[in-house]
């Protein structure tokens, strides 16, 4: 355990950000009884150094939080595996499988490695293996599984209820062409 005077004085970014989070989000974590941080993964390609860096930075934040406050923490690594396959990565076999499935959700695209049900599942498993090799402590969640379990239903209903307000807020931030097709349900 690091001396509290050092924790409060350091300008090391994980501690600076952790101090802000602990101060600004106190009501939330006291209500929930824990602090949850999240990383995101777009499984249209294999995990890489950027994936590692995001989880490493988040882990540094968790470690700093643990020095500041005695509260349970967790990291959720969330895979956006319902994203559409926009392009074919250079480092995959059986490219013709992917060519036939462009723009489909990654968990609906067959695995070109022929090891899993889908390309999304393959890359999710590669991510978990990658993170486990570095002994990261995380909870894995899949967009596909979360949708199928209905865990987004409340939020989706709220988006539907606030549809026009959301569009009014977002449309001015988009280019003219994107403004024509934007929907909160199809960002």
Predicted regions and their residues:
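Amphipathic alpha-helical segments that form well-ordered structural scaffolds
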Residues: 60, 64, 122-133, 158, ...
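The substrate-binding groove and active-site-proximal loops of carbohydrate-active enzymes
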Residues: 5-8, 43-52, 105-118, 144-148
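Active-site cores that bind ATP or allylic diphosphates and position pyrophosphate for catalysis
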Residues: 132, 136-187
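Glycine-rich, histidine-containing beta strand-loop boundary motifs that form or position
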Residues: 39-41, 77-79, 134, 142-144
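A glycine-rich helix N-cap at a beta->alpha junction
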Residues: 94-134
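Non-catalytic terminal extensions that flank enzyme cores
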Residues: 1-49, 63, 67-77, 90-103, ...
């Amino acid at each position: 355990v690091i001396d509290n005077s050092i924790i409060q004085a350091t300008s090391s970014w994980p501690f600076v950000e952790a101090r802000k989070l602990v101060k600004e989000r106190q009501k939330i974590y006291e209500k929930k009884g824990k602090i949850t941080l999240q990383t995101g993964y777009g499984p249209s390609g294999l995990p890489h150094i950027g994936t590692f860096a995001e989880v490493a930075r988040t882990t540094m934040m968790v470690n700093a939080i643990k020095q500041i406050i005695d509260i349970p923490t967790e990291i959720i690594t969330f895979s956006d595996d319902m994203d559409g396959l926009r392009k074919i990565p250079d480092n995959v076999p059986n490219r013709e499988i992917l060519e036939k499935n462009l723009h489909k959700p990654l968990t609906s695209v067959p695995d070109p490695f022929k090891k899993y049900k889908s390309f999304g599942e393959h890359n999710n498993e590669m991510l978990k293996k990658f993170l486990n090799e570095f002994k990261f402590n995380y909870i894995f969640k899949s967009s596909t599984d979360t949708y199928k379990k209905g865990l987004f239903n409340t939020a989706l209903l709220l988006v539907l209820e606030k549809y026009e307000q959301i569009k009014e807020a977002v449309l001015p931030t988009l280019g003219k062409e994107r403004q024509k097709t934007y929907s909160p349900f199809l960002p």
